[in-house]
Amino acid sequence: MKLIKTFLFLFVVLLVLSEVSAEPRFGRLIRLIVKIARRAHRARSAVKAASNVAELAHGE
């Protein structure tokens, strides 16, 4: 079920991006959204790595 929801979400996002990208003024907005998404992903990865390190340190 989660896979289906993820697929549908990605499909909708790609559909919206294809419609929006036809408008030149939205190009800057799309780049900003992508930049924010990348920052959020890096932050999430850093938190996950720190959590893993803390678990390893606590386990020993």
Curated annotation (Swiss-Prot):
Record carries keyword DNA damage: no
Top-level taxonomic group: Eukaryota
Secretion signal, residue range per the UniProt entry: 1-24
Main location: secreted
Chain segments annotated as transmembrane: none
GO biological process: defense response to bacterium; defense response to fungus; killing of cells of another organism
GO molecular function term, any single one: toxin activity
Annotated tissue distribution: Expressed by the venom secretory cell of the spine. The spine is a cuticular structure containing a single large nucleated venom-secreting cell at its base. It is an independent unit capable of producing, storing and injecting venom. On the back of D.vulnerans caterpillars, spines are grouped together by 50 to 100 to form scoli, of which there are eight in D.vulnerans.
Record localization: Secreted
A single Gene Ontology CC term: extracellular region
Annotated keywords: Antibiotic, Antimicrobial, Fungicide, Secreted, Signal, Toxin
Family: Belongs to the limacoditoxin-2 (cecropin-like) family.
Role description: Peptide that induces pain in mammals and has insecticidal, antimicrobial and antiparasitic activities. Induces irreversible paralysis in D.melanogaster when tested at high doses. Shows a moderate antiparasitic activity against the major pathogenic nematode of ruminants (H.contortus, EC(50)=24.5 uM). Has moderate to potent antimicrobial activities against all Gram-positive and -negative bacteria tested, and against the fungus C.neoformans (var. grubii), but has no activity against the fungus C.albicans.
Official protein name in the record: DELTA-limacoditoxin(2)-Dv12
Annotated source species: Doratifera vulnerans
Organism lineage: Eukaryota, Metazoa, Ecdysozoa, Arthropoda, Hexapoda
